[in-house]
């Protein structure tokens, strides 16, 4: 429950951002592959990439 509320709060803050450059860095490791399944599970959207060995999701 706490994890879900953190994600919702992050999305709320990101949606209010003037610049709209919001990204959510996960603790899931990756190697140049797609992070779509991780992002779909974390934020419900399949937009993400592998940056510095971690999945970064974009709402």
UniProtKB/Swiss-Prot annotation:
The record marks 28, 40-41 as: Hot spot basic residue in hERG blocking currents. The keyword Aminoacyl-tRNA synthetase does not apply. InterPro entries: Scorpion_toxin-like_sf, Scorpion_toxinS_K_inh. Keywords: Disulfide bond, Ion channel impairing toxin, Neurotoxin, Potassium channel impairing toxin, Pyrrolidone carboxylic acid, Secreted, Signal, Toxin, Voltage-gated potassium channel impairing toxin. The record marks 58 as: Aromatic residue of the functional dyad. Pfam families: Toxin_2. GO terms for molecular function: ion channel inhibitor activity; potassium channel regulator activity; toxin activity. Residues 1-22 form the signal peptide. Expressed by the venom gland. Disulfide bonds join 30-50, 35-55, 39-57. One of its GO terms (cellular component) is extracellular region. The modification Pyrrolidone carboxylic acid is found at residue 23. SUPFAM superfamilies: Scorpion toxin-like (SSF57095). The keyword DNA repair does not apply. It is found in: Secreted. The record marks 49 as: Basic residue of the functional dyad. It comes from the Eukaryota. Has the structural arrangement of an alpha-helix connected to a beta-sheet by disulfide bonds (CSalpha/beta). Belongs to the short scorpion toxin superfamily. Potassium channel inhibitor family. Alpha-KTx 15 subfamily. Blocker of A-type voltage-gated potassium channels of cerebellar granular cells. May also inhibit Kv4/KCND when coexpressed with DPP6 or DPP10. The occlusion of the outer entry of the K(+) conducting pore is partially reversible and affects both open and closed channels. It shares the same target in rat brain than BmTX3 (AC Q8I0L5) and AmmTX3 (AC P60208). This is Potassium channel toxin alpha-KTx 15.4. The lineage of its organism: Eukaryota, Metazoa, Ecdysozoa, Arthropoda, Chelicerata.
């Amino acid at each position: 429950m706490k994890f879900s509320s953190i994600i919702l709060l992050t999305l709320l803050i990101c949606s209010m951002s003037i610049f709209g450059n919001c990204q959510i860095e996960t603790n899931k490791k990756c190697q140049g592959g797609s992070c779509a399944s991780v992002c779909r599970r974390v934020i419900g959207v399949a937009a993400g990439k592998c940056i510095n060995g971690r999945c970064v999701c974009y709402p």
